């Protein structure tokens, strides 16, 4: 998360996350699921809605995979309508969801309620053995969350973009002894220091 994208209200919210709201801990648990449920490179399938493609989160997860050395965290962006001639990494369509299987993870990212066609595909992927993770907002999406093995809602006081940054950072954390030097709480504290001075 870049400091220039964080305003005063978000600084207050982020400080609240550090102060023990519980959300940061839930994000860490969710990040661990992102990190451990895909069993091979290419097995983390990231999909949004017809109106929202999670480009930025996919890029952040790719960075975290590279920095942490966790190959299975490298995401595959699944798109509703890839344009003709798109490069291979941007040409993966919904047929990939139909091929999802045990050992793969379908990560659904949506700021709005998931449309019925998406819910149907997600449910089918679960039936074939894929792990379903969901990131949404506010009080969550009841229908999507009921299908997901793990779901996390970004609080309304935090932008969805900021929430995606924090989730991707959590996914890149190593477990104790794994050698990752900067944990999620550390990274958030450094961000706040750069924006408004040291945290209490």
What does each model-identified segment do?
Residues 10-14, 27, 34, 90, ...:
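Generic structural signal of hydrophobic/aromatic residues within well-ordered alpha-helices
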Residues 1-74:
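Extended, compositionally biased accessory segments flanking or bridging domains
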Residues 55-176:
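Glycine-rich phosphate-binding loops that contact phosphosugars or nucleotide phosphates
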